[in-house]
Amino acid sequence: MNSLVALVLLGQIIGSTLSFQLGPNMDCNTKGTKDWADIGVRYINEHKLDGYKNALNIIKIFRLLPSDGRSVIVHFKLNLLETKCHVLDPTPVENCAVRQQHNHAVEMDCNVRIIHDIATFEDEVFVKCKSTPDSVENVRRNCPKCPILLPPNDPHVVDSVEYVLNKHNEKLSGHVYEVLEISRGQHKYEPEAFYVEFAIVEVNCTAQEARDGHHQCHPYTAGEDHIAFCRATVFRSHASLEKPKDENFESDCVILDVKEGHAHSHLIQQHIEKYSTSPGHNSTDEYVVECPVAFVEKEVPTDMSDHDTPPVKGCPGRVLHFQL
């Protein structure tokens, strides 16, 4: 569970109208510094390919870099915490609950550079992040019986998701859903069970066509209540090697108001091949977020590290939630 995932983001936010103050009294706790950090957090959440939105936790470092006089360049390091809102959830991140430590929290450390054009108020944003869950040892030290995070591709997690989805489809008339992404899986104790969170999408198949395996089902586009996010608990033994057949379970699926053309519509396109498992806690590979076509030719700065420019005073800033 100490595996890391690197997330590299590149792009641009147009039309920033915030009035930024870069005075001698700035530190990592001032409103002006947080305004800059909020731009970075918003950009990360809008371009994150899978998993969950992240909330600001700590501004670790904030630097004002030398510029040509036509722009303001800032570089800062952020610590973020995973929320309970999936990236497809339209809820503003400010209204999303941060996943607490007893629920096996996940943090993300990010290097952010923003180039603010003084004349046009346009912001060019470069972000590189690394995500890692809290260690199993820490979770068990503080809460011995709390559920432990599992890889989304763990067989018990996958079987539980498919079992719940089949039960969900059996209750529907004229609608068939398939898994869009497995986002989270946890092993629970007393009673033993598997807790899963996953996104589903409606497809243009009948129930029989979806079962026979010979018909290629295509997901509907976003909008019109075609995408939902589910949370479920399947009560079964970890020692069980068979797929669940008649297990007790609890589930809740909520329709997401995802508009067509949403930034995360790529998930639907990926589904045409096969549903994905979020790599957020299990992969050690870097992956590059697909950028809007208008910005695809821009290059990620090779130097996203610390600079000779000293950071502002009062850093790191205060912890907004908790520190892992």
Swiss-Prot record:
Q: Which GO terms describe its cellular component?
A: blood microparticle; extracellular matrix
Describe tissue expression.
Answer: Expressed by the liver.
Feature type site, description Cleavage:
140-141
Entry keyword Chaperone: no
Q: Which SMART domains match?
A: CY (SM00043)
Which cysteines link up through disulfide bonds?
A: 28-315, 85-96, 110-129, 143-146, 205-217, 230-253
- Which residues, renumbered to this chain, are glycosylated? 204, 282
Write out the annotated subcellular location.
Secreted
Task: Using the record, list the residue span of the signal peptide; answer none if the entry has no such feature.
Answer: 1-19
Q: Which UniProt keywords apply?
A: Disulfide bond, Glycoprotein, Metalloenzyme inhibitor, Metalloprotease inhibitor, Protease inhibitor, Repeat, Secreted, Signal
Major subcellular location class: secreted
Residues covered by the Cystatin fetuin-A-type domain: 21-130, 141-254
PROSITE patterns noted in UniProt = CYSTATIN_FETUIN_A, FETUIN_2
Q: Spell out the molecular function terms from Gene Ontology.
A: cysteine-type endopeptidase inhibitor activity
What protein family is recorded? Belongs to the fetuin family.
Subunit info here reads:
Homodimer.
What the protein does? Potent inhibitor of hemorrhagic activity but also proteolytic activities. Inhibition occurs by formation of a non-covalent complex between this protein and the proteinases at their metalloproteinase domains.
Q: What is this protein called?
A: Antihemorrhagic factor cHLP-A
